[in-house]
């Protein structure tokens, strides 16, 4: 299909957005947004949406940016469609002071930048997809921070679509609900979105990876906090008396199957992921995330955590290990499988733009998981980005433009 806007629009937006720090903070997960800086991008987007004709664009109390675009002539009676992306970036890599730049990639190692005199590079051995990107212009960070394509690429693509419609309102589309959510990276992105006011029958998140990804299955997810209480005794008098909480953690961690760690799993294989641990002789705390697409296997993983704690307590003859499980989200396939038309239409939109759709299980979660269970079926589309959550993150310029084309084709099919 022909581009109806020049590529610099989506690119210019993306380059601006990634320079606004929006890292969420898991330590503040009891408040939304977890970081005040998310309001900085939220306010920019709301103002830009108003400039593009979305008169009701606003930033709600918890940093949700919401706006509505009227339907094109003849599509006024069609159900409203939502397009959703998230404001925040992950805190697992440096995210403030992003300095994006464009690398014309000619093959071999992709060097994003240089830090402390050393190149920050990604090899084709580690990322074979680079072999298909020779001669492409790639947006990278300078190697000292993540880029923020997750999910500011999705934000920019949605905003560029809105700009196209503002320029030519005759482009076919139903009424559109636009939403940019906070705190997706810490699992709270869709919790406080007012679905009734949003007013959409269906929605798509634009939060995937390389262009063509189409996802309607995600993990079942929980967080397990395991606490170990020790008993400190002078090590010279410790025999039969000391309980070392740090060693208890080591024993516990060894009871979880190492082949079910993220670095050994792929596809539909679930995992236990140790996100952090602090330990002394007296006290230790370990935080795991537990993931599996299959609900029964997911429950088995949670049961094994409880069983490991019980085994250690039984060995010690008293309770030194406690487990707290916090459910995070469920596999949205339970809901979305009843709406196959959402998958079919997305495939058609990709194909119309010359992109081969790749239907894959999400090895993670999106805002669409929560929204689907709250009554808004919501598959996930690609953004075009690669290597999320790290300093090697990048996105091809052509993918930013092509995904905007895909969104244009998508909304036309709902008109």
Tell me what each language-model feature is.
Residues 7-35, 140, 329, 389-390:
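N-terminal capping segment at the start of a domain
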Residues 75-175, 180, 200:
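Active-site metal-coordination/substrate-binding segment of hydrolases
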Residues 29-78, 82-84, 88, 99:
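A non-catalytic alpha/beta surface segment that caps or lines the substrate-entry region
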Residues 26-28, 56, 170-175, 258-273, ...:
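Flexible, glycine/charged-enriched surface loops at secondary-structure junctions
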Residues 127-130, 136-149, 183-306, 310, ...:
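Midchain, well-structured core segments that form catalytic/ion-binding scaffolds
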Residues 45, 157-165, 249-252, 371, ...:
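Buried hydrophobic packing segments
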Residues 243-262, 296-308, 344, 348-351, ...:
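His/Asp/Glu-rich mid-to-C-terminal helical/loop segments that flank catalytic regions of hydrolases
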Residues 247-264, 271-273, 320, 330-378:
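Active-site-adjacent substrate-binding region
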